[in-house]
Amino acid sequence: MNLARYRLNDESITSRAFAEMRTNGVCVLPGFITNEAIADIVREVEALAPLAHRSAPRRNPYLTAAKGANTHAVELHDSLEVLAYDHFDPEGTLRSLYECDDVLHFVRRCLGLDVLHRYADPFGALNVSIMRDGDVLDWHFDMTDFVVSIALQSAESGGDFENAANIRGNDNDDQVVAAVLRGDAQERVRIEPMTPGTLMLFNGRHSMHRVTPIKGMTPRFVALLAYDTKPGTDSTDALKLSRYGRLPSGRLA
């Protein structure tokens, strides 16, 4: 971590981050991870990449099956590969970062929470998305209140994180969502800077977002760090099979 720039116990930093989250639903902290640490993590991801599970789910913007009326009936698709928590070296840079209590408490204060726990999911507590040429993560809302991510490597072209902030929960949200999906509401969309080393806190439950199609031979790597206010949080077997292609050892689908 770049402790010269981000002192983890500095209340002015965490207070400013909390204010940005409350106002905009997103907080971007560039250069949070040092270049040396990013290089170490990228080397590990590249070595592990053959183990990643590729998926191409189809769903609507609310991450459910496309059915019903209006924007709930719009079918979108994703394509990406994912490395799971148990792929990574317990002594490696990325797992050490996720399992660091100082980082946990820094994130907790940035989110304005009294309590925060790491996920108990053996695959999804920490995972890395790998997006290659032609891959996309189309428009969607998250099912959780916040996502914590670290940008590791940018694609040659594309791979922008586009955010239509705070459009859910209003009386006309379906019309706004439809306009964004059509490309008719560019004034509502902004690109969040995700340069390597950036830590981003994001409330995707109310903000629709996407990753634009990847172009070129350099894949996009992003680490996702999973936390919850409740202890012992795990994902469903269905999600594990969809995202990681397997269940924990000894369990059958």
Residue spans for each PLM region:
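Non-heme Fe(II)-dependent double-stranded beta-helix
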Residues: M1-E11, F18, R22, F32-F106, ...
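Short amphipathic
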Residues: C27-I33, P193
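Short strand-connecting beta-turns/loops that link adjacent beta-strands
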Residues: T34, T144, S157, G216-M217
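Short beta-strand segments enriched in hydrophobic/aromatic residues
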Residues: V45, L152, Y227-T229
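Phosphate/oxyanion-binding loops and surfaces in catalytic or ligand/nucleic-acid-binding neighborhoods
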Residues: L48-L51, A155, K230
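Catalytic core of non-heme Fe(II) oxygenases with the double-stranded beta-helix
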Residues: L104-L199
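Catalytic core of Fe(II)/2-oxoglutarate
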Residues: E162-N166, D171-A253
